[in-house]
Amino acid sequence: MSNGENGHNLGNAAHLHANVTRRRVLRWSAAGGAVGLGATLLSSKPWRAALADAKPYKLGTEQPLTGVAAYGGKSSLVGVQMAVDRINKSGGINGRPVELVVADDQSKPDTGRRAVEKLATEDGIDFHVGGFLSNICLACTPVWEEHKIVNMIGVCLDTTLTTSKCSRYTFRTFDFAPAQAKAFAPYLVRQIGKKWHILYADYSWGQSTRDAYTAEIKANGGEVVGSTGIPLGTADTTSFLSKIGGDFDGLFLIFFGSDAINVVNQGTDLGLAKKYKFAGDGAVATSTQLPAMGNKIEGFVGIDRYLPVFDAPLDTPELHSFFDEALGRLKKVDPSGPLPDRYVQSNFEAVNALKLGVEKSGFQGRNDTPKLIEALEGLTMKAGPDFPTGDKVLRKDDHQVFMRELIYVIKDGTYHVQQAVSWDQTLVPPACHFPAA
């Protein structure tokens, strides 16, 4: 895998790397303040002394803080840290504080596997929230199973994680491609055009997302006339893009980070945006990437679970509060001030879902993992400060959440919501078969 990075998006990644490669564990501050990533906020409430003396829960988080996905790892870590700080400020979980152990997977599956093995053995974590690149999530699944540790996925979107390769120990508290495709395909076919060519990142997430959209576009009367995979980290994509042509209506893009920037910018320079409508997964146009694409992303139609705007139905107190706090935290690690994105949101809500499960199960340590799994299966999450994107249910059959989807268009450099699709309109049948307990 390439380790090429987009400098604009990485922001202060080097600073983050310096703070986390020592695998720092969050420690209590007697003064009740926090400094950078190495401390946790405490308030001066009466329970403060008792909370500080209680045995902490150890929460591990594996993130790509260097390498091709570093920009997303930065946002993801902000989401985890934000949730942990809020939990500790409000009294912890079951009267116990939460300590965070951070590991850098360097955007590499082998490094990621070694990192989570160390989290499980040497660091002795109780549970885990994180994972960005799907190939790394898949590589780490056996570690969670071997050590019987609950794993709340932070970002990984590969379809198989909650279908053919599902695990009793792994949960995804946000959407996935089959649900997005079911929500988006009718709009693509009826509002844009019937014939599509799919351009995708040629690894597990891109491939499974390609398959999901191919199926749903066909189910809605459309046609996928071709597909083109581009390896991760390809700086010059023109050799792939220049071969695309023919009679079809739209190019559906499945990329993230610098790869998305390269495909959009280079594809526009080749004239593809004049010939075909650009649409795609929301990862193509996250808020951290928009500046690097400028007006070349104008008119792009995408789908996402979270957008940093307040068009209806997003103008809620919970989303305003989430936005304001996340924005302030992002500015501390990247002075350019990137807006909150889907990666902050999904990691933030994953920690809060885990908190509910720990409270419900009375989890005390890894021996209680079966109780925690049972508490998380079918867990109901209600819209509010902990779940600003709205109500959702964690399905027992496959440990997959379904949630509201937002179809948007990029105009004048920002998002404009065109349609909100309720979670119940995104449901797909479970395709997971857990091994016998």
What is the predicted function of each stretch?
Residues 1-24:
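N-terminal secretory signal peptides
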Residues 119, 123-132, 152-154, 197-200, ...:
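Periplasmic-binding protein-like
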Residues 54, 71-78, 91-163, 173, ...:
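Beta-alpha junction/loop-to-helix N-cap segments that form part of ligand/metal-binding clefts
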Residues 267-348, 361-362, 421-436:
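Extracellular/periplasmic periplasmic-binding protein-like sensory domains
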